[in-house]
Amino acid sequence: MAVPQPLGQIGDLARRPQAAGFSGLLFTEAGRTAYLNAAVASQAAPGLELSTGVAVAFPRSPFVTACTAWELQEATAGRFRLGLGTQVRTHVVRRYGMAFERPGPRLRDYVLAVKACFSAFRTGTLDHSGEFYHLDFITPQWSPGPIEAPDPKVDVAAVNPWMLRMAGEVADGVHVHPTGEPGYLKRHVLPNVAEGAAKAGRSPSDIAVIVPAMTIVGDSDEARDTERESVRAAMAFYGSTPNYAFIWDEAGFEGTTARIREKQKAGDFKGMAAQITDEHIATFATESSWDGLAAALAKKYAGIATRIVLYNAVGDEERFERYGEVARRME
């Protein structure tokens, strides 16, 4: 998993994990554009699977997103996955200036509209009429045209039961939240995805469960202590979002997210991190030596995750190589 960087740096960023043995690279989206980063990476590291994980859906029309994904699928010879998410109201309305009403149903319609565009690029006929998007006009001049690769897979970020069912019904994969510990995955993700798949006459195995695994790894207490503090800060950030509170509550940490939000409102960022105990970290992250990490992740997510994203696989060349060895052991 990588945060988008200046485009001039992406070539090296993509080549390093490929050389280390990773099968793919996933770009998040924040201040920079995940799609542009993926485009540069596709030329710098041919053969590497690339994903947006996740791109913000609503600021772009379904047609624009479909065209971009289509070109990336062509550029990667069929190794691109389109990951989409709603973001939250404040960002979509106040930063992007777009509508956010009923984000779940809107994203469902968005995914179907994107897939209708994929079909139109092959057939020349665009026909999607949904609750939020109506697309019925395309000409050869405004179509990217057919490609040899299959249609891109479309994955969605989902946390609550409705969104998980929607993912099972219309998407090709679901991006689980980084705090998605195994209990949450078993209680909510797998059964709701299966229910959505059944509604659409699909098999649950058709939907990839994509899990970002936070890791604390090192061969000494000192090395792991440093990583633990980094994970603690990330967990404090995630704990400040009300929509994720039920995951913490069900894991036995009721009230933790409320305390984190109190510290956030007061501007006490150190206090936010101080609310994260070692017990929280043991639940939501995986701690191990380098030699034991692959086995620890495989054991933790066996029968749950289809794909594991190494959330903390960043750093210098040696660190990339060691995480690459972990990735190879898990294949």
Language model region names:
Residues M1-E331:
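Active-site-adjacent structural elements that line small-molecule/cofactor binding pockets in enzymes
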